[in-house]
Structures are given as C-alpha cells and as structure tokens.
Amino acid sequence: MVAAMVAALRGPSRRFRPRTRALTRGTRGAASAAGGQQSFDLLVIGGGSGGLACAKEAAQLGKKVAVADYVEPSPRGTKWGLGGTCVNVGCIPKKLMHQAALLGGMIRDAHHYGWEVAQPVQHNWKTMAEAVQNHVKSLNWGHRVQLQDRKVKYFNIKASFVDEHTVRGVDKGGKATLLSAEHIVIATGGRPRYPTQVKGALEYGITSDDIFWLKESPGKTLVVGASYVALECAGFLTGIGLDTTVMMRSIPLRGFDQQMSSLVTEHMESHGTQFLKGCVPSHIKKLPTNQLQVTWEDHASGKEDTGTFDTVLWAIGKDAASHTDTVSSSRKPYFLGRRVFAFLPITSWILHSAGS
C-alpha cells in the first residue's frame, strides 16, 4: 500500500492519473471560494500505524501532506489520542499489562529461589493503569511531534467526503474545515464488534477499547470470544490475580494451528483461567449489587445457565471503522474491499486504502 502511494506521488504514472480532472477542478475551485479550503498533495484519513507511516513517507518525498484523525468515543465513552489501535488500545498497553502479569508470576515463584516474599502477593490495578496510560499519552505526544517535525499538518477532525478530491472535517466543537488533495488515503482501521442480538450487551459490556483505560479493577471478568484478543486479555487478567472466565462458541484461535491453540488454552487453564466451551450468551442484566448476571446457552446440553460477574468483555471480532460514521459520505454508502469505494467509479485511482 505505502509502496503504491510512493509510486503515485513520485511521478505522473497513467495508473494514478485522475480521469475526471476538469470536473474536479471546477468543484474544488467552487468549494475553495466558498469555504477557504486548504489543499495538499496527500491527505491521510486515520492516524494509526498505516496512516502515519504513509504520511511520513510522503512527506520525506517533499510532498505537502495532512493527516485527519478523529476517535469516536466507545459506547462506554472511552477515547484516546493519536496513534491508532496499536498505541492506544492494542499492542502497547496489552504488552505492558502482560508484563505486569509476568512480574506477578516471578514474585510468586521467588520463594523457591530464596527470596522471602510475603504471600499472597497483591496487585494494585490503579497503579498499573496509571503507568500504562501515562506511557500511552507520551506516545500520543511523540507522534504529534514527529508529524510536526516532518511538516505534516495534523487535523483532529471527523472526515466525510464531498467528492473524490475533497473532504469536509468537523472538530469536536462543531467547526467545519474543507480539505482537498491530489491523493487521499483511507486508513481508519477497525473497532470492536458488539453482539447486538444479546440483550444488555451494549449497555453493560466493554471491549478492548475500554479495558486498558479503566480506572478501577475490572474484578471478576467474563471474556466472551476466543480470538487472540480475547485470550490475551484473559491471560493478563488471570496473571494479575483476577477471577477470569473465557466463554467461547466453538474453537479457540480460529484460523491458527489448532494443536498450538490447544497448548495455549491448556497453559491458561493450568494458571487459573476458566473456560466455558460451546456456550453462547443470550442476555445480561444488572443486579442491585451492580454486578452483572449473564445468561447463556450450553450447546452441548441444550440447557441455560447463569453466572455473576463484575465485568463482561466482548472480544468477538472487529468491523472496519469506515462502516460507521468515522468516515461518512454525502453519497450512497460505500465499503472497503476489492473495490475501495462503491460510490466512486472503479477507474478512479486517486483514492487508496490501508490497514484493516
């Protein structure tokens, strides 16, 4: 993807030459006169790993580049800064919390090597969360500085297309900005999926968008799903001493080697993670104690069962953020896929997509 963009920006290849130039110029000129829009060689929508890499590469080629990034708060109100999923709600905080779990295991084993450590070892979620969140915020700032150093213009705006060369962005205060560019990259990533068929899922559940930004310990946690995100979260929650259960509909780590998947789940079980296999949740309700009562169906027995938890974490997959309002259009709905945008002609080579 980045290589294709570099080729497009380096020279007037036929493949990347717009085919509706005269019409586009007129549209852009009218919009500019009306709204005083800013123009760029490249506009990147999305400030995650792919978008930032693309923007920096183009800037190194001497192009005038802008990045438009906006984080739609999760249903629980969680939001974050520049850097995308990996920096804010993915790789970085996950690895830090995993490290906290590993340290706990080392401390528990230390007495075998002569260290006299009071047992049981207690973990303070607030202390860990504050350290993780402060580190993430430092990375947010670092990305801002890197863009500034490369003379990449950063806009904290929610983008929607006016036409294939023009984007309208609205900031959190409602102020609109018009941006135009020779090439536009869509790199808006994905957001966790909620099981909307499960009553109470949206009202009472959280996702990986929220777990790393909780101020208080999640307590006894039910993780629904068997993806790597589900097992990673369940693993570090168990590792820091929380009562953790994984509910999975079928097999763990679908798409991965199943012999290795079995070794992973067996290892987790040996360390205290519980698994509910062949189970699907049907509804959640909040009890007077503020705990969550989860009802599920056991496919093996055909019976219903219930359990009480402090937190329910959905980890059942992601949807492309472009399917939501993160990037919207005044024209008919579009999708990302083999045809990048359904509302644009296939012969248009000025729109590109990157990432998930």
Please annotate each region the language model reported.
Residues 1-36:
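N-terminal mitochondrial targeting presequence
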Residues 9-12, 21-23, 38-40, 57-63, ...:
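Glycine-rich flavin
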Residues 39-67, 230-239:
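N-terminal Rossmann-like FAD-binding beta1-loop-alpha1 element of flavoenzymes
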Residues 45-46, 69, 78, 224-225:
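The Walker A (P-loop) glycine that initiates the GxxxxGKT/S ATP-binding motif of P-loop NTPases
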Residues 91, 186-243, 247, 271-274, ...:
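Glycine-rich dinucleotide-binding loop and its adjacent helix/turn
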Residues 246-249, 262, 266-356:
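Internal nucleotide-binding/catalytic subdomain
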